[in-house]
Curated annotation (Swiss-Prot):
Modified residues (N6-succinyllysine): K15
Superkingdom of the source species: Eukaryota
Taxonomic classification: Eukaryota, Metazoa, Chordata, Craniata, Vertebrata
A GO CC term attached to the entry: mitochondrion
Protein name per its UniProtKB record: Haloacid dehalogenase-like hydrolase domain-containing protein 3
Keyword Calcium: no
The entry's keywords: Acetylation
Species for this entry: Homo sapiens (Human)
Gene label: HDHD3
Gene3D superfamilies hit by this protein: HAD superfamily/HAD-like, Haloacid dehalogenase-like hydrolase
Keyword Transmembrane helix in record: no
Length: 251
């Protein structure tokens, strides 16, 4: 007779799964620039940030830790390059803006808890599930979660900066399992990124659920993920867990 699967550990992505920026990034950057006497279009800053972040992540992955950078310096460089790409060539004028933005994005008021997130976390705890965070965030995450009243829900918060490996590297998931003293078969991960949050945990034998944001899911991703693993909202998580636990392990 087959044993019933029981999930005991739920690990969570944070950005765009539990939290999001209170204001669009381009607007936040433009507002801070305006306070320092610079007028820059939010759309140009948004586009510049995407390019700068992608290039920095490629050249210095995981905050450049293996290159001797700190996450703070990594982010300051991203902001400087963002403004450069948006047409601001005066790095000296941007430097204090970058410093202030780093502080602002460390503050809980810059972020907002997504609808249903706190209720879902509370219901998971009521069920007896252990909860933890696995995030590609930096060292500021603990303070942000604490300021928003979410830290108390988690046994531990594991960032890629602390672990030394970013998702989807299998080692960050293995480290979380080690910290929790759990086997992968009784653990599941929840997040919004297909590679980092869906495929990554499955590579080490965990289960996973993909949270769908306001944008339509890429057709290739949609076709490769069973519909019972897709969460249109966090309110769908507990029913999806019930469905998973009603299945036969290994099938």
């Amino acid at each position: 007779m087959a044993h019933r699967l029981q999930i005991r550990l739920l690990t969570w992505d944070v950005k765009d799964t539990l939290l999001r920026l209170r204001h669009p990034l381009g607007e936040a950057y433009a507002t801070k620039a305006r306070a320092h006497g610079l007028e820059v279009e939010p759309s140009a800053l948004e586009q510049g940030f995407r390019q700068a972040y992608r290039a920095q992540s490629h050249s210095f992955p995981n905050y450049g830790l293996s290159h001797g950078l700190t996450s703070r310096q990594w982010w300051l460089d991203v902001v400087l390059q963002t403004f450069h790409l948006a047409g601001v060539q005066d790095a000296q004028a941007v430097a204090p803006i970058a410093e202030q933005l780093y502080k602002d994005f460390s503050h809980p008021c810059t972020w907002q808890v997504l609808d249903g997130a706190e209720d879902t976390l509370r219901e998971c705890r009521t069920r007896g599930l252990r909860l933890a965070v696995i995030s590609n965030f930096d060292r500021r995450l603990e303070g942000i979660l604490g300021g928003l009243g979410l830290r108390e829900h988690f046994d531990f918060v594991l960032t890629s900066e602390a672990a030394g490996w970013p998702k989807p590297d299998p080692r960050i998931f293995q480290e979380a399992l080690r910290l929790a003293h759990m086997e992968p078969v009784v653990a599941a991960h929840v997040g919004d990124n297909y590679l980092c949050d869906y495929q990554g945990p499955r590579a080490v034998g965990m289960h996973s659920f993909l949270v769908v944001g306001p944008q339509a899911l890429d057709p290739v991703v949609r076709d490769s993920v069973p519909k019972e693993h897709i969460l249109p909202s966090l309110a769908h998580l507990l029913p999806a867990l019930d469905c998973l636990e009603g299945s036969t392990p290994g099938l």
